[in-house]
Each structure stands twice: as C-alpha cells, then as structure tokens.
Amino acid sequence: MDIASPPTSKCITYWKRKVKSEYMRLRQLKRLQANMGAKALYVANFAKVQEKTQILNEEWKKLRVQPVQPMKPVSGHPFLKKCTIESIFPGFDSQDMLMRSLNTVALVPIMYSWSPLQQNFMVEDETVLCNIPYMGDEVKEEDETFIEELINNYDGKVHGEEEMIPGSVLISDAVFLELVDALNQYSDEEEDGHNDPSDGKQDDSKEDLPVTRKRKRHAIEGNKKSSKKQFPNDMIFSAIASMFPENGVPDDMKERYRELTEMSDPNALPPQCTPNIDGPNAKSVQREQSLHSFHTLFCRRCFKYDCFLHPFHATPNVYKRKNKEIKIEPEPCGTDCFLLLEGAKEYAMLHNPRSKCSGRRRRRHPVVSASCSNASASAMAETKEGDSDRDTGNDWASSSSEANSRCQTPTKQKASPAPAQLCVVEAPSEPVEWTGAEESLFRVFHGTYFNNFCSIARLLGTKTCKQVFQFAVKESLILKLPTDELMNPAQKKKRKHRLWAAHCRKIQLKKDNNSTQVYNYQPCDHPDRPCDSTCPCIMTQNFCEKFCQCSPDCQNRFPGCRCKTQCNTKQCPCYLAVRECDPDLCLTCGASEHWDCKVVSCKNCSIQRGLKKHLLLAPSDVAGWGTFIKESVQKNEFISEYCGELISQDEADRRGKVYDKYMSSFLFNLNNDFVVDATRKGNKIRFANHSVNPNCYAKVVMVNGDHRIGIFAKRAIQAGEELFFDYRYSQADALKYVGIERETDVF
C-alpha cells in the first residue's frame, strides 16, 4: 500500500465542500422520507376510518328509529325543578323532566404513573436530559432559572436537540454510515483518474449535472450491494471531523465506521464468540471458551442470566462444593466399559475425587524417575486435579481449564511427577474420530463428572465409555497442573464461635460510631494474598462474603450463626451485624430449610424469602395516597421491602432537584454509593407517609451481599391501620414538605 502524500489546501477545501453538500442532501432525503412515511400512514388510517364509517352507516340504515314517548311531569313534587329536553332530530317531541341534582364527589388524589416492582432494579446514569419538566401553565422567572440550572447539570445535553447545523451536530449512526459511503465514491473516482480535486470550478460544474448525480447514486447502490468494499480514505474522516468536531477525532470516526460495518454483516460473529456446538461449524475448544457465555451472562449471586442487579458480575467461585461427588460404579456397565481395560480400574479409582475423614491430611505420592510412562504422568495430573479437601473447603477448581476461566489472575502452573505404583493403560486398538463438538462437550463434562467416564459417555450419546476413557488419557498428556501450594492448602483450624461473636460485636460498634459510612459490597479478588489493609472489603468495613475469592479460613470472612432459636436478638451474630441469616452459612437456625417457609424457626430471613404482608392502597388522611395493612402484625415483624430503581448518588442529586420542585420525592439512601428511587418503579410501600410518631421503621439490611431496605413494625399494628415511618427530614424540610400530622391514637 502506497503512503499517501500530505493533502493540499485545495484538497481539504474540496473534501469539506463534499461533506457539506452530501450531508445536506442526506438531511433533505431523510426529511423527504419522513414526510412520505407520514403521508402514507395518514392515507392508510383515513382509509380504515372511511371503511369503518361505511360499515356503520349500512348497519344504521337497517335499524328502525322509534321516537321515545314523552313523559308526563309528576305534579306531586312541586318543590323539584323541571327542565325541558328538546331534540334536534325530526320526529322527537320535546319532553319535560324533573331535574335531579347530584352530590359532590371528592376528587381522587393525584397519582403519577409508576411501574410495580418486587425487587430493586439497577439503572445507568442519565447523562442526557430526557425531557424538560413541566412546571405549570404559568411560567415564572424562577422556573426559567431552574430549567437553565437543570440543563447545566446535564452538561447542556437534552434529548432530541441534535440540530442539523455543521459545527454543532451529533450525527446518528445511520446518517454517519450513509455519509461515509456517499463520500467514498469520490475517493474511488480520484483513484481512477476521473476526478481531480485541483480542477476548481470546472469540476464543480460537472458535479451539478443531474445525469452525473444519478450515475453517482447508482454507483453508491452498487457499492452497497457488493460483498467487499474498499475501506474509505483517511481524508474522508478528517473532513467530517473538521466539519463536525463534536463527533470526535478522525481516529474515533474510523473506529466507529469499522464497528458499524461489522455490525451490519449478518455472517460476522461477535467477538469472543464460539460457533454453535450443535452446528456444522463446531470447533474443538477448551472448557473456558465453551463456557465463556455462561460465565459472562450468568450471575452467581442471583443465579440468573442477564442479572439486572449486579451489572459487574463477580468471578465464579473457584472452590468445590462440599457435597459428595458422583462415585464410579465398581462393576462394568457393559462389554465396552473402560473398566475392562488393563489398569483402567486402578487409574480411575486413583484419580477419583475421594472424601476424607476430619483431621486427616492429604498424602503425597512419592516422586519417581523420569523413565515412567507418559500415561502415568498424566494420571498423576488427574489425581491432583481431582483431589479435594472436604474439611477446609479450600479446594481447587474442578479442572485446570475451569480454574483459568474463573480466576482473573492466571495461576502459575508446572508439570506433575508420576506416582510410583500405577499400571500402564492399554493403548487404543483402533483410532476413533472425534468431532469438534464431542471434544468440547467432553471437556465441559469432565469438569463436573471428573473420571466417571460411564456418565460422560451416557451424556455424549455418541461414544462408549471405553472410547471416552481413551480420549481422556490422551487429553491428560497436555493438561497443565496447578502448583502444589494451591493444591495442598494448609489445614483449616476450627473457629471458636464465642470469639467470633465478640469480634462481630467489636466490628458493629465501630460501624455504629460511624454509621454514615456504609459502602456497597464488592467481592474481593487478590490471589495468593490474604485479606489485609489493602483488601477492598476491609477498607470499606465490610465482611468477606461467600462470593469473595479469598481463602475460606479468612479472618474477615463472615461464617454465619450457630443459633438454635429465632435469631431476632443481638445474641445472634447475623442480627448483631444487621444482616439476614445466609442459608449457605447458617445451617442450624433454620435459614437453610427451604421446603416450608411458614414453619421456619429463623425470623431473620424474611427479606430474601419475600415474606411481606398484604398491603392496601387508598387515599390517606394526611396527604395524597397512603399505604394500609390488611392484617395485624406484631412488634419488629417484617412488613415489606422498599423497592425501586437503584441509582448512583450523582444521579440521585440530579433527580432530586426536579423532585424538590414538585415537592414529592421517593428517594431513599441505601449506602454511600447507591440510592433507591421509587418514583418511576416501586411497590405499594412507596405510598407510606411521614410521621414523627410512626408505627413502622426502616432498616438497611445486608442480604446475601446486597444492601436492601426493610420496613418493620415499630409497635403492634392493627388490621386496616395506615402505615407511617420517619423520613428523617431536617427541621426545615419537615415544615416545608409535611403540613399535616396524623392524629395519634392510643391503643
């Protein structure tokens, strides 16, 4: 490719003129297309109305109109007023009727539209003002000043204000793509020698000919239909950037054009996308590549795909579960079972993950000379890979490929020595062909079933367990192994529950002294390093949760409670730490019992189970609408969760200025990072009004790593009573927003 010479001033002027003319043409074309589309819709709708009207007229002609007989006025009610009703249609006589007045109906309180939610919904910050808020028919001077300040908070960006004026234009993707394609034709003509930009007026006069323009339009359409187009010249992007500087520099525009053209290609795969494993183009890839979409889209905290509460998903836990793995059947499953091979049974039993008794240390295999077979070395690889520490829970991943896909930082790996006493596995007699899909599926299944080749063969459905075993032996020769330090962690020491309860009290007292500093929890991930002062959990005074990547015996990890009661007093470490009992950690209090929620002994798991009360919505005696409870509740009993949009503190400041102007706000501080806004989305508890003598109270509780707002009964509440809680207004705001205080009833 030849290096282009620096553009001259005439060339730059030429391209700027082309950018302006083509942009104005596209702008006019877009307007024309919009007008034509509106006209077509109007004609279609008018035709439908005409058709419906004609059908109704035909039906009315078939009906016989019968005049109503006039009613005689009742003379027995002289105190009632009479009125005469006259009809404009012929054949109907005037009628005298008694006038009856209707009683005044109380107006329904104003309610703005909102969407119901049952849990929080995280949204992105709105950097562009969606609409100018309506401040009433009479616009005051302070309203104009407020709107100007509001627009300045969004850096002057208002939705729909992209004016089509060069110099202050934000070009849309569709217009930008068409503009570059339209300008690319002039670059092709320059290369062919049909157009010289230095030719001045003579060349401009030729461009204005309609025949030439039509020919150029056909050329553009032909370029669009061609399968492979030449990438536009850099001068085109430079000219567009000079005319529309708000759209970025030439390099940004070039990258933008490349992304838009790749998106328009239907055959192009997205980045890091593996071909369909069931399709004809399936490839043989490693386990982490096959499960890439699963690890990316699946939230391990909510157990949902495309979670809307954790946009930054935590890395999957690299430790094995503590339950028993699937055992290998001691007897062969058939004539083609791998257990019939010489040395296969010893190989499988040696490599099968085995449970260990409490306090029993892992035994290391003796290192032998390098003359051992490769099969033996691979077998030792599988042994280390399959071992797990049941007592400590500090197990390595199910396979090395899974571990690499789950860890953010790659672990150091080295070869493994072979065991001294291991039989050589019989080599396959006939080569068996494996497709890419089968090889990929084997690597995925092996991370879960390990050396249970009979189960893997049944899942594959196309290979016998003997063939699966032979392929596993072949695969183990190239698998890398984790280091001995990661495979053989130190034995876990039992933590004394009383010492841990005292530690929780000390941490909680520290938080109570600085109660405003409550930060959002993010799982820590610092491999090969304990949780110290640099750990994000310790820096934010949060406990390490089960989602953290630190060691299970971390001193900052919350172990749960060992209560045998209802967990509703400060004797429970979970209740003391203002968090709900975790069903994965608290195994004795009843939080882990999922079958019958109504008979669970633990009373500290209501939010995560959604055990809310039945609430009613009705006009309030204080202001607007109010929330009423249908059933009676006891003191400190959970009523409902305050749900809404989860927004940042900066977004809450921008929205709060508009809400203060309307004198209606549903913002609720969650922690130092996020705020719950129930204005657009929420549940019925959003209508609970403020009171200095409330019957409810709000509490921010840590529930499975997430801060959530629970509304609890401050005293015993009777059925049908309206709910109030303290908004914690300042003295000035309380006088400004709360004009009526409810009458306190004595129960």
UniProtKB/Swiss-Prot annotation:
Chief localisation class: nucleus
GO biological process terms on file: chromatin remodeling; facultative heterochromatin formation; hepatocyte homeostasis; heterochromatin formation; liver regeneration; methylation; negative regulation of transcription by RNA polymerase II; response to tetrachloromethane
Stretches the record annotates as Disordered: 188-231, 368-414
InterPro entries in the record: CXC_dom, EZH1/2-like, EZH1/2_MCSS, EZH1/EZH2, EZH1_SET, PRC2_HTH_1, Pre-SET_CXC, SANT/Myb
Start-end of Basic and acidic residues biased regions: 194-211, 382-393
Pfam family, one: PRC2_HTH_1
GO molecular function: histone H3K27 methyltransferase activity; histone H3K27 trimethyltransferase activity; transcription corepressor activity
Sequence ranges assigned to domain CXC in this UniProt record: 504-606
UniProt superkingdom: Eukaryota
Localization terms from the record: Nucleus
Compositionally biased spans, kind Polar residues: 395-414
Reaction it catalyzes: L-lysyl(27)-[histone H3] + 3 S-adenosyl-L-methionine = N(6),N(6),N(6)-trimethyl-L-lysyl(27)-[histone H3] + 3 S-adenosyl-L-homocysteine + 3 H(+)
Family: Belongs to the class V-like SAM-binding methyltransferase superfamily. Histone-lysine methyltransferase family. EZ subfamily.
Purpose of the protein: Polycomb group (PcG) protein. Catalytic subunit of the PRC2/EED-EZH1 complex, which methylates 'Lys-27' of histone H3, leading to transcriptional repression of the affected target gene. Able to mono-, di- and trimethylate 'Lys-27' of histone H3 to form H3K27me1, H3K27me2 and H3K27me3, respectively. Required for embryonic stem cell derivation and self-renewal, suggesting that it is involved in safeguarding embryonic stem cell identity.
Name under which the protein is recorded: Histone-lysine N-methyltransferase EZH1
Species: Mus musculus
